[in-house]
Amino acid sequence: MKLSSEKLPKNPFSLSQYAAKQQKFFQWKKEKPDYYLHANLVDTALQFLKERIRRGDAMAYFLRGQLYFEEGWYEEALAQFEEIQEKDHQAIYQLGVMYYDGLGTIANAEKGVNYMRKILDSSCPQTMHLKFAAAYNLGRAYFEGKGVKRSDEEAERLWLLAADNGNPKASVKAQSILGLFYSMKEPKELEKAFFWHSEACGNGSLESQGALGLMYFYGQGIRQDTDAALHCLREAAERGNVYAQGTLVEYYYKMKFFTKCVSFSKRIADYDEVHDIPMIAHVTDCLPEFIIKGMAMAAFYHGRCLQLGLGIMKDEESAKHYYSKACRLNPTLADELHSLLIHQRI
C-alpha cells in the first residue's frame, strides 16, 4: 500500500486570506479582465508578494514558497523554504514533505523524517496546527520503512496520535489510514477498521466513505446492511471515488441491470491510465492502488457485457480490449474475476 504525504494544514495565514486583506491585490481584476487567465493571476500574485517582501513582510516569504509549491515549481519552492526555515515552521513542514517525496530534489527520506520530528517535538505554539499532520507523516515513514526502521507498531502509535480520537481538526488522513491498516493487518481488526472509517467519513474522507460502503455490503466489522452500503457507495461514487464506482458496476452486473452497468462501466474503464490516475488521486485524496482497482473492475465487467451482448451490441474484439486493460491495470483482480467467469459465477 503506497501512501501519500499529508498536505500542509490550513492556518489563519492562507494566501487567499492574506491577499484579501490587501485591497491592491485585487485591483487588477477590475482594470484588466483578461488577467483572469491562470498564468496571469499567478504572475500578479508573485508581483504582489515581491512588493510585500521588499517592504519587510516576513509572511510573504513563506507565501511565495507555497505558491511555487502549489504550481509545481518545486526547485524554486525548495530554495525559498530552505532560506526561511529558521524563522518559519510551515517551511520546515514543507521541507519534510519535499525531501521525503523527492520534490525538487533527490529523495532523502531520513532528512524528511528529521524535519517532521522537529515539528512534532517543538514546543512553539506556532506548530500546533502542524503536529497532527507531522505525526501522520512520521507514521507513514515507519509503515514504509523509509528513513527509519520499519515498524507497524510505531506507525500505529503515531497514526493514533495524529487521529486524536476522531477530532475533525486532527489528521483525517490518519483516521482513514487507520481504517485501512486495521482491515489489512493480520489478524484483521474489522471493528476498529469500521470505527476509524466512520470517524474519517464523518470528517469528510472520500476514501473512507467508499470503504464503509464495502464493509456494510459484506458485513465486515458491522452487521450486513445492503441499503446502507448502497447509500455510502453511491455518495462516494458521485464524489469521485473510483473504487466505489467499480464496486457499483459489479453490483449492477450481478443484479442484471445491464444497460446501467454498460454505461457506467465504460465511463470508468475509459479513464486514461497515465494521466487520469494521478489527477484523480490528487483531487480526491484516494490512494492510486484503489483507483486502479476500481478501473480494472469496471474494465472487466464492461468486457463481459460486450462479449455476451448484455445491455449493448455484442462485440468480441472490443471485449478483448477491455479484458486486456483489466489485466494490465490489476492482474490479480483480473485473474480472480476470470476464475469466477470460468466457474460460471459471472
From Swiss-Prot:
Listed SUPFAM superfamilies: HCP-like (SSF81901)
Subcellular location, record wording: Cytoplasm
One GO location term (cellular component): cytoplasm
Keyword annotations from UniProtKB, A to Z: Cytoplasm, Repeat, TPR repeat
Sel1-like repeat copies, ranges: 92-124, 132-167, 172-205, 206-241, 242-276, 296-331
Quaternary state and interactors: Interacts with LRP2.
Function field: May act as an adapter that regulates LRP2 function.
Record's protein name: LRP2-binding protein
